[in-house]
Each structure stands twice: as C-alpha cells, then as structure tokens.
C-alpha cells in the first residue's frame, strides 16, 4: 500500500495536466529531482517543513516552465515537457553527483512515507485526502470545470469565453505541485534518494494509471478517483 501510494501521487499530478488537454513527459523526472532536493535538505538539517516546502516549490516552478513553453512559446506539450524532463534529469545528476543520498535516523520525516496511524499507512491517508481535495477542485469549482472544458473541447470552450491559457497554466502548476510533494513522500519512503535521475518508470506507470482510470466511468473521462 505504501509503495503504491507513492506512485499514485505521481499519477494524480499527471492526471490533472491531462484533464486540461495537456501532457507532461517531465512528471517522473520532476518528482525524482524533488526527491533528491528533499533528501539533501534533510541531510543539511533543515527539517521536514523545509523539505516539503522545497519539494512543492520545485513542482510549481516546473509546472510554470512547462506552461510557459507551451502557451507563450507555442511548443507542442510533448516536446516542451520532454525538454523539461532532460533538464530535471541533468539537475538531479548535478545535485547528487550520481550518488544515492541516504538519510540517517529522521523519525519525524520518515513517518510521512512509512508511519502508521493504527493499522493504516499514513501515506495512504495523505493520498485519500489529496484525492478528495483534487476531486472537489476539479468537479465542484469553476476552475476545475473550466479545466475539463478546455481539455474536452477547446473550440467550444473558447466560444463560451473560456480561454485556454489561464486554465492550462493552472493545470500544469497544480499538477506540478502534486508531483513535487510526491517527490518528498518518495524520499521519506525510501530513506533518501537513489542515484537514478530519469523517473521514466514512474512516468509509464502513472500514464497507465491515468488512462486506465478513465475507464471507470461511461464517458471515458479522466478523473482523479479513477486514477
């Protein structure tokens, strides 16, 4: 359950981007970079709050860069996010020097990814809460409904006065936030960060989870609960 929950966070972040008609090849690499930054922050003695904040900021920045490349510079989402993936991979290798970052005893930080509340893994509780929040935002708020509208039929959305730029940017940044937090959780779960930089295994599994999850409703609509 704990290992699956970590992957589910990455899949949730990717699903948010897909809902608005985007695509994010950088999802796994960004999470892996956030994992390394979180591990390095803990090794430096900055504490769990700093690790969480840095992970979230990393994801937000990556989302903003992806949005800028797609919406301002007009690059295809696949190409833009592939470029960000390679940048994140390079940044990870530069940061960790190709070496695993292993944490010593950090009981408070380790609780995020490994702790239990009764018989239930704490990370599973975090996953359920995050899923509920995202479901509410995407299905019960104007922001979320317009993200769906842009993703499902851009022409119809624009005829109704719903511009693509604002809601596609929101999807990249919200998805990036979740991906950054996923990286922090992964650092907690795995006692640090591995020397790997690609995160490609996370990306493939997350894509599979998102698209298979769309089969849970008759419309074949992407949704965080299905993911």
Named regions from a protein language model:
Residues 1-47, 68-75, 207-224:
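Single transmembrane alpha-helix segments in multi-pass membrane proteins
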Residues 1-7, 48-58, 124, 196-206:
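Structural signature of hydrophobic alpha-helical transmembrane segments
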Residues 73, 77-140, 167-170, 189-198:
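Transmembrane helix-bundle core of multi-pass membrane transporters
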Residues 133-173:
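Membrane-helix/interface signature in polytopic inner-membrane proteins
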Residues 158, 163-187, 200, 204:
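Transmembrane alpha-helices
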């Amino acid at each position: 359950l704990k290992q699956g929950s970590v992957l589910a966070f990455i899949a949730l972040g990717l699903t948010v981007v897909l809902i608005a008609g985007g695509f994010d090849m950088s999802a796994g690499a960004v999470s892996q970079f956030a994992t390394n930054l979180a591990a390095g922050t803990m090794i430096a003695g900055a504490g769990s709050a700093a690790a969480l904040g840095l992970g979230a900021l990393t994801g937000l920045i990556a989302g903003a860069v992806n949005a800028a490349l797609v919406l301002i510079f007009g690059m295809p989402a696949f190409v833009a996010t592939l470029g960000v993936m390679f940048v994140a991979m390079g940044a990870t290798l530069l940061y960790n020097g190709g070496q695993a970052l292993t944490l010593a005893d950090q009981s408070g930080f380790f609780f995020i990814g490994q702790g239990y509340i009764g018989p239930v893994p704490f990370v599973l509780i975090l996953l359920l809460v995050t899923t509920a929040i995202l479901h509410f935002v995407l299905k019960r708020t104007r922001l979320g409904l317009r993200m769906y509208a842009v993703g499902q039929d851009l022409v119809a959305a624009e005829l109704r006065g719903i511009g693509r730029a604002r809601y596609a940017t929101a999807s990249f940044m919200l998805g990036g936030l979740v991906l950054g937090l996923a990286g922090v959780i992964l650092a907690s779960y795995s006692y640090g960060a591995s020397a790997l930089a690609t995160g490609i295994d996370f990306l493939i599994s997350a894509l599979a989870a998102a698209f298979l999850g769309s089969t849970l409703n008759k419309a074949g609509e992407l949704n965080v609960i299905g993911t």
